[in-house]
């Protein structure tokens, strides 16, 4: 291959709507290592996820890169990804004889061992295995020198032909295996001289007593069960389990998508939907101390419906890491977020993971519907304030070091995400345009956690704060309730985002009674327009490669900074004349829109429909 890898085109060769296990066990057209193995859909999925290492180290547009990647799968991948260890067609292919130059030892090399040697340059064995010596060295390392232990191989993994090749004589003393050990072990040669009767007798005794402990002989002597073969991936079949749902996501993760599964749990509880929560850990850079739904977390699924509150790529990682057991026979719903205008072409294969998709906003729904082969349902998410937040109590400005007598605008973002999407610099620019340095009755609070100190946007924000004492930076990891108390201590939440899938932060600000200024684009428009938020006009702008995940061919909003500045001035003027509060009844309306009760009713209705359809089928 000479062209760069086009992931979407390669995945397009897989069958769709037959279940992930079956679809990903099919070979990818045009990707193979001749004489060793095809590259299967599951391989490509792993490679796609690992853009920081595997894509760099093993370019699939070269034969050597593909061979190196398959070697990595054998050496490391099968231990990291349960789904890979279950990829039966791959392992059956690797159990075949390697195609090598003929020699005394060539008939004992499997394709599995061939890939292992290719990936273990530290062994000093010619990776091409062209000579008899190299082939013998490979066999001895594997069966005679601990290789089987390094790879955690069992007797079930040793093909019958390889067993027969090495144990080719009824008498172990005269077998190829015994000769292999003698030729590579000078210590055995010295102790058991083969030209003497005593030496032969001693070697026979050693083979019987010591070899089973020092070598891989038991792998060759043990006969594995073959009457009942291992599970083979087949087109998806469902099981009939009791009413209820398994909610899957970052149960303890302190980030926005962790809130998705936590709010879904609260909605199910209020609606009387039986449920359990399966935790899937995010990256190590995410704090996992939110224990608000810990009482519902379990290790094993209990019900026949899965609702996966992760991104499509994290859902894929979940399948690859945990394997098929979590999904096999269960109706799986992908409650997937997305921010940009179009669903990524490179992610379309992920629809194989689900039976239907739930979209938390019309924005996501439209992006999904243009790409999805499975049904897409609009399912808004619940937004709930923690019990610790008392909206009737006095605000706590002094606690956060904020001035008591200013109109405060606030915005919060997670530095672990793409800062350019959240656009905090746009908020700073709008504030500076709205209010000259002589306007001392206003202030801007920028709350961030996990910022990248080297990020140029973050540096500009810090510089602006250093030059303008009205701008307050709070760079800290706060508990959820504390973040909301910070919001409540301010007057207006400003989000000049370029893209937003749902807009949970905006919704929380509304529940707290803050004025809201937000870009008139993204999932937030579902509730911002009806709620009377000040919406900022925008123009669609094409993204540059690397600006965001799957940016090629995408668009997002560029909010009008001048319009945002006018909105800030309007809020400040109104609040300076009188204490502006929510119109009568609007606070209650917000609770009706976002409440766990309202959302739980919608969930229950859809789940009941699914159970009824399942019963009829």
Give residue spans per PLM region:
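Conserved catalytic-core segment of nucleotide-activated headgroup transferases in glycan assembly
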Residues: 253, 259-267, 275, 385-480, ...
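Short hydrophobic beta-strand element within catalytic cores of glycosyltransferases
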Residues: 515-518, 534-537
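Aromatic "clamp/platform" in nucleotide-sugar-dependent glycosyltransferases that forms part
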Residues: 498
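Donor nucleotide-sugar binding/catalytic pocket of nucleotide-sugar-dependent glycosyltransferases
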Residues: 355-366, 373-391
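Extended catalytic core of nucleotide-activated donor transferases of GT-like folds
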Residues: 143, 224-236, 246-248, 266, ...
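A charged, aromatic-enriched C-terminal amphipathic alpha-helix characteristic of glycosyltransferases
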Residues: 555-559, 563, 575-607
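Short acidic alpha-helix that forms the nucleotide-activated donor recognition element
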Residues: 478-490, 511, 543-546
